């Protein structure tokens, strides 16, 4: 396993995940009967500050259909948590208009690179073009100065 599991922290994430799903109207318990489901949800809500007990609630009451989705969510959250500790692995998001994203994705695909690598390459290309333009301008001025002196 690449990322260390932190039981208390992840139990808090699981609690938040389940509460969010409940508020969105999903069935988070394995019970069909509404009163039994509500009792289990009430118990879960009371466990907010008891992360160790959340895993017990999950084993006993959680809807089996949510198991894989919750595991995926927690795995992604764990990865983001550990990557955020180091500047070089921290991820940032940017908003792009769809057409811009589409063109960038097409360029990345043609170049066989990731979106991030393509953006870095475009920036480097622009910087090199700017350096070249400055150098040519400087050479042009030097040449004009030489020709003007003679």
UniProtKB/Swiss-Prot annotation:
Keywords: Cell cycle, Cell division, Cytoplasm, DNA-binding. It is found in: Cytoplasm. GO terms for molecular function: phospholipid binding; protein homodimerization activity; sequence-specific DNA binding. Required for spatial organization of the terminus region of the chromosome (Ter macrodomain) during the cell cycle. Prevents early segregation of duplicated Ter macrodomains during cell division. Binds specifically to matS, which is a 13 bp signature motif repeated within the Ter macrodomain. It comes from the Bacteria. One of its GO terms (cellular component) is DNA replication termination region. Disruption phenotype: Mutants grown in rich medium show severe defects in chromosome segregation and cell division. Pfam families: MatP, MatP_C. This is Macrodomain Ter protein. Its main location: cytoplasm. GO terms for biological process: cell division; chromosome organization; chromosome segregation; protein homotetramerization; regulation of DNA-templated transcription. HAMAP family: MatP.
């Amino acid at each position: 396993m690449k990322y260390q599991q932190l039981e208390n922290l992840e139990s808090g994430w699981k609690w938040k995940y389940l509460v969010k799903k409940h508020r969105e109207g999903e069935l988070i318990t394995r019970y069909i009967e509404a009163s039994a489901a509500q009792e289990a949800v009430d118990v879960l809500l009371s466990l907010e500050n008891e992360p160790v007990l959340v895993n017990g609630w999950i084993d006993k009451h959680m809807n089996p259909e949510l198991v894989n989705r919750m595991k995926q969510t927690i795995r992604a959250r764990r990865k983001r948590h550990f990557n955020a500790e180091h500047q070089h692995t921290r991820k940032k998001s940017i908003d792009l208009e769809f057409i811009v994203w589409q063109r960038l994705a097409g360029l990345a695909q043609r170049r066989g690179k990731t979106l991030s690598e393509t953006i870095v390459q475009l920036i480097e290309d622009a910087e090199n073009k700017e350096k070249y333009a400055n150098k040519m301008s400087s050479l042009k001025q030097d040449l004009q100065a030489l020709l003007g002196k003679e």
